[in-house]
UniProtKB/Swiss-Prot annotation:
InterPro entries: AAA_dom (IPR025669), MinD (IPR010223), MinD_FleN (IPR025501), P-loop_NTPase (IPR027417), ParA/MinD_ATPase (IPR050625). It comes from Helicobacter pylori (strain ATCC 700392 / 26695) (Campylobacter pylori). The lineage of its organism: Bacteria, Pseudomonadati, Campylobacterota, Epsilonproteobacteria, Campylobacterales. Interacts with MinC and FtsZ. It is found in: Cell membrane. ATPase required for the correct placement of the division site. Cell division inhibitors MinC and MinD act in concert to form an inhibitor capable of blocking formation of the polar Z ring septums. Rapidly oscillates between the poles of the cell to destabilize FtsZ filaments that have formed before they mature into polar Z rings. This is Septum site-determining protein MinD. It comes from the Bacteria. ATP binds at K11, G12, G13, V14, G15, K16, S17, T18. The gene is minD.
Length: 268
């Protein structure tokens, strides 16, 4: 039975879709059968990050409205064994989703995959509640900014109140991904520190992605950065291993001496 992992955020533009794409590839390359599902109806871009935009014929709404069957809509990534993709509709209204149709889709996917990664709309947008409804695990992507943290705190509350697991008295395993970290700005007091982020959101940390220009270049080429050897690629690989249950040390990025010693202390 598949594990449903919803990748979400409190606001848009924090790297949620990029994170979904790279973790989907990481899990697939670890031997897991993975499907990445784009639930961001009307604003899809997961297809471009994966380099699959030219292969879309049917989308998730077509499946739910029975315009096609699921196998017709699923796209197999030719570059990554074990990875499939289900695109969001670019033209339909987000309100077209309903709980019954979403449940049918997720149950069908559970039968065939080890991991279902859902790229959720941001928490302030319509459709968010459908994306977190069936989550076993939620990865909350934030940037070290006040607005991102504030909106993400609201998202955590919705997950704890409205997911199916929460309604059954079970916990959705929530973890924090801090994206676009600039250690030099933290060291200078110009960016919120990791320790402060953890205190504000009270979620366990599963990974830190440093600011990296390679991500922009990779996205523009439709080649997810995890396939490269840059620092952000290694960060996504470490998060993948943690999702799979490995204990992976948190590494030091280049910054003023002493900055990451505090981080190490949190996990010692």
């Amino acid at each position: 039975m598949a594990i449903v992992v919803t990748i979400t955020s409190g606001k848009g533009g924090v790297g949620k879709s990029t994170t979904t794409a790279n973790l989907a590839i990481g899990l697939a390359e670890s031997g897991k059968k993975v499907v990445a599902v784009d639930f961001d109806i009307g604003l899809r871009n997961l297809d471009m990050i994966l380099g699959l935009e030219n292969r879309i014929v049917y989308d998730v709404v077509d499946v739910m409205e029975k315009n096609c069957n699921l196998s017709q809509a699923l796209i197999t990534d030719k570059k990554t064994k074990n990875l499939s993709f289900l695109a969001a509709s670019q033209s339909k209204d987000k309100n077209i989703l309903d709980k019954e149709k979403v449940a049918i889709l997720i149950n069908a996917l559970r039968a065939d995959f080890d991991y279902i990664l859902i790229d959720s709309p941001a928490g302030i947008e319509s459709g968010f509640e459908h994306a977190i409804l069936h989550a076993d695990m939620a990865l909350v992507v934030v940037t070290p900014e006040v607005s991102s943290l504030r909106d993400s705190d609201r998202v955590v509350g919705i997950i704890d109140a409205k997911s199916n697991r929460a309604k059954k008295g079970m916990e959705v395993h929530k973890h924090l991904i801090i994206n676009r970290l600039k250690p030099e700005l933290v060291a200078n007091g110009e960016m919120i520190s990791i320790e402060e982020v953890l205190k504000i959101l009270c979620l366990p940390l599963i990974g830190i992605i440093p600011e990296d220009h390679h991500i922009i270049s990779a996205t523009n080429k439709g080649e997810p950065v995890i396939r490269t050897d840059c620092e952000s690629a290694k960060a996504y690989q470490r998060i993948t291993r943690r999702i799979l249950g490995e204990e992976v040390e948190y590494v030091e990025f280049k910054a003023k001496r002493g900055f990451f010693s505090a981080l190490k202390g949190i996990f010692s």
